[in-house]
């Protein structure tokens, strides 16, 4: 789009590195005011600088935000400065805004590649700011949400399906909620605390899923916050089963153990998910359902596990029974340098057996 003389003048004004506050009223009159601050343009890299994005947003991203906000003045301005109007169309969630984008040259059909490019650009940035921005741009925005969910739904669905046995819980997840869950998982796994807090605060109806994710990703302090402060409750043995879905989830498994979860059930879950470190951890915590566990292992053709369970060499680890309350700091300290005595017993047996 060929820029007007007016937009060119605004570009020069926005490119000034430092403007005294006396100029602020001029910037407001010129439409160079956004989020209670002047719009600043880095012409070398074509970045829009905002108070909550000090490192700057590229023009296409700024255009997407303006389109989501139905800000026609900025949509036109950013397009004249060089942004691709098709990116604005991605986030145009009202008919008048879509029509305005068409007037500025947007394609009538949504470009799926551009949608996925921007989505993964935000997600892979792995900062709280970008995760929150990604969610705000695409959530409750049926056109791009539909495209994104079609691309990620299959892998995400089976990822979630592994965590919960209640299929009704999955069936009730809307496309918007699935997108929210995906963004939350990225934030939680990468310890993006600002983004995690954002989801906790704004999406209370997904609290059960927040608890499930904390269990699965071994996030002890999040689990304690959700369980004790938010009072989110599901069956304690189901909590333990979810914690057992990933290997080395000792922190969340121990938390469930202290709350009273059946450690023999956890032993069977460790076999079900073929997680050997979890299995030895359960034995250290006193699990003794060896016959049932062997039968399950043989049923699944896990003969190496069955052999390990047939050995009469295991004993609980007394050091793991010192805590009586689910205190996350104490649990973290207790398990910080944890080494499985049961695994050591098996390795010693295996070494002696092969050398004799």
From Swiss-Prot:
Keywords: ANK repeat, Glycoprotein, Host membrane, Membrane, Transmembrane, Transmembrane helix. The keyword Membrane applies. GO terms for biological process: taxis. It comes from the Viruses. The chain crosses the membrane at residues 206-228, 249-271. ANK repeats lie at residues 58-90. GO terms for cellular component: host cell membrane; membrane. It is found in: Host membrane. Plays a role in virus cell tropism, and may be required for efficient virus replication in macrophages. Belongs to the asfivirus MGF 360 family. This is Protein MGF 360-10L. It comes from African swine fever virus (isolate Pig/Kenya/KEN-50/1950) (ASFV).
């Amino acid at each position: 789009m060929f820029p007007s003389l007016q937009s060119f003048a605004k570009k020069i004004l926005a490119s000034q590195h430092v403007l005294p506050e006396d100029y602020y009223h001029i910037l407001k009159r010129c439409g160079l005011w956004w989020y209670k601050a002047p719009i600043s343009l880095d012409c070398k890299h074509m970045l829009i600088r905002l108070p909550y994005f000090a490192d700057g947003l590229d023009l296409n991203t700024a255009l997407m935000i303006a389109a989501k906000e139905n800000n026609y003045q900025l949509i036109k301005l950013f397009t004249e400065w060089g942004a691709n109007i098709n990116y604005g169309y991605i986030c145009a969630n009202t008919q008048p805004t879509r029509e305005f984008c068409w007037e500025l040259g947007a394609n009538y059909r949504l470009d799926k590649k551009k949608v996925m490019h921007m989505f993964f650009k935000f997600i892979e940035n792995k900062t709280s700011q970008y995760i929150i921005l990604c969610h705000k741009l695409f959530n409750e925005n049926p056109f791009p949400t539909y495209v994104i969910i079609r691309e990620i739904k299959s892998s995400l669905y089976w990822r979630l399906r592994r965590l919960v046995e209640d299929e009704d819980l999955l069936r009730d997840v809307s496309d918007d909620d699935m997108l929210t869950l995906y963004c939350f998982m990225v934030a939680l796994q990468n310890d993006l605390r600002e983004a995690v807090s954002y989801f906790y605060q704004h999406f209370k109806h997904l609290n059960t899923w927040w608890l499930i994710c904390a269990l699965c990703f071994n996030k002890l302090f999040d689990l304690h916050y959700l369980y004790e402060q938010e009072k989110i409750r599901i069956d304690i043995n189901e909590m333990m089963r979810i914690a057992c879905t990933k290997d080395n989830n000792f922190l969340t498994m121990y938390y469930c153990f202290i709350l009273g979860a059946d450690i023999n059930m956890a032993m069977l879950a460790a076999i079900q998910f073929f997680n050997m470190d979890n299995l030895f951890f359960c034995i250290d915590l006193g699990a003794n359902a060896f016959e049932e566990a062997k039968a399950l292992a043989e049923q699944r053709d896990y003969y190496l596990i069955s052999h390990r369970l047939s050995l009469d060499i295991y004993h609980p680890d007394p050091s793991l029974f010192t805590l009586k309350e689910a205190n996350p700091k104490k649990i973290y300290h207790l398990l910080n340098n944890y080494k499985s005595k049961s695994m050591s017993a098996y390795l010693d047996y295996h070494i002696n057996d092969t050398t004799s």
